[in-house]
Regions:
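Short, flexible, glycine/charge-rich loop motifs used to bind or transfer phosphoryl groups or to couple energy/partner
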Residues: 21-24, 132-133, 188-191
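Flexible mid-to-C-terminal extensions adjoining Fe-S/redox cofactors in radical SAM and related proteins
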Residues: 156-212
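Short clusters of hydrophobic/aromatic residues that line enzyme substrate/ligand-binding pockets
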Residues: 19, 136, 164-167
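A C-terminal junction/extension of Radical SAM enzymes
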Residues: 61-154, 159, 193-208
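Structural motif
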Residues: 30-32, 140, 162
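Radical SAM/AdoMet-radical enzyme domain recognition
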Residues: 1-102
């Protein structure tokens, strides 16, 4: 609500595991919520039926209230062995027919499935990519906020390796104006990754085609 009042169009991205515990979100829905069921297989988790049941219960209620819900299967060419099972579980909650789109399906009003190619998540233990030019929307169009209030450049930093500050201690303006945050922003403006973790992220390579 505060974001809307300040003129922002809030979009949240989540793996959906905590949505059933955050029902108050239904009373202050953002413009869009992007939920990533592909993370379930990628993180080697079990009980997909329980997970999808919780995700779809929330998704359908949020969509009915006008929030755009996008269920993302961004794992083509990678951890996608469970995709068919996940689609079948989704269909139990929102039966076909679905309207086919170039990047997935429209299941119902405000409810979509989107598929795309898999990219490598950043891993500080891996070697850096040898790429002369990269780009990322981190701190430009998006930030990540972990469950404890830690702000990171994007949602791929799930361990908080690039912690920029905590919203329970600092304002977002203070966090984004910090020297480290500004260095990351300027780096991607110049098509370079200044942080080691970003140098090991496959998305910064994929997204360079969107650079601006």
């Amino acid at each position: 609500q505060t974001a809307r009042q300040k003129g922002f169009i809030p979009v949240l991205t989540t793996n959906g595991t905590l949505l059933s515990q955050k029902k108050e979100l239904l009373d202050a829905l953002p413009h869009k919520i992007q939920i990533s069921p592909h993370a379930h297989e990628g993180n080697d988790r079990k009980n997909a039926d329980t997970y999808i049941n919780k995700v779809m219960t929330f998704a359908k209620e949020a969509a009915a209230k006008g929030c755009i819900i996008v269920l993302r299967l961004w794992n083509e060419g990678g951890y996608n062995q469970m995709n068919e099972a996940i689609l079948q579980l989704i269909a139990q909650h929102q039966p076909a027919p679905w309207t086919e789109r170039k990047d997935g399906w429209k299941l119902a009003e405000n409810l979509f499935i989107e598929h795309d190619n898999m990219f490598s998540w950043p891993d500080s233990k891996q070697a850096a990519y040898d790429e002369p030019e990269v780009f990322c929307y981190a701190l430009r169009n998006q930030i990540g906020v972990l469950a404890d209030g830690t702000v990171v450049p994007c949602c791929l930093d799930h361990d908080g390796e690039l912690a920029l500050g905590n919203l329970f201690e600092l304002s977002l303006e203070e966090i984004l104006s910090s020297p480290r945050a500004q260095a990351i922003y300027r780096g991607f403006t110049n098509h370079t990754a200044v942080e080691g973790l970003c140098q090991r992220c496959g998305f910064s390579i994929v997204s360079k085609r969107f650079r601006r």
